[in-house]
A protein has these predicted regions:
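Non-heme di-metal
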Residues: 1-167
Length: 167
């Protein structure tokens, strides 16, 4: 990174990403508890929560290594990250106040994961170190896996559209 200002912004962005991943984990743990009577749903929420905790730890590692490993955070995405952070915390507040049914929860989780995946696709962080780059590439792939898992489960429990016979 060039200059203390950019490095400071990069640290803020990395910490914001940590908070986003931690917030996602909290959301999914909450949904696992809300839907505990549906074992498949509870397991899916719990699995996703644990994966988000790993993502949080990955950003925490990036914060610690930022000054030691050549990396660059794209701080131009700060505003977008702040919006995702705000939307996530609004969703978490709503879920805690008014627990959603499973279909609504899945739809909102998919929407949030897509926002996060878009943020990650814009390459928030670039590493020159191959090992670090691979770890973050795995994070980006995991975003797509989360979306796919949630979408498949939603499709499996959603009723078919009216007027079209079920197959």
């Amino acid at each position: 990174m060039n200059g203390a200002v950019n490095n400071s912004k990069a640290h803020l962005l990395a910490k914001l990403c940590m908070e986003i991943e931690g917030g996602c984990a909290e959301l999914y743990h909450c949904l696992s508890e809300i839907h505990r009577n549906d074992p498949h749903a509870a397991r899916l929420w719990k699995k996703t929560a644990l994966e988000e905790e790993k993502h949080r730890k990955l950003f925490e590692l990036a914060v610690h290594l930022m000054d030691e490993v050549e990396c660059e955070f794209v701080t131009a995405n700060m505003e977008r990250a702040l919006i995702v952070h705000q939307k996530l915390h609004e969703l978490l507040h709503i879920v805690k106040k008014n627990p959603p049914d499973l279909i609504t929860a899945l739809g909102k989780a998919i929407e949030m994961e897509k926002h996060i995946a878009d943020l990650h696709v814009e390459s928030l962080v670039h590493f020159k170190n191959e090992g670090m780059r691979r770890m973050f590439d795995a994070l980006y792939r995991a975003d797509q896996d989360h979306i796919g898992s949630l979408e498949r489960y939603l499709a499996s429990i959603s009723p078919p559209p009216t007027g079209i016979p079920a197959m």
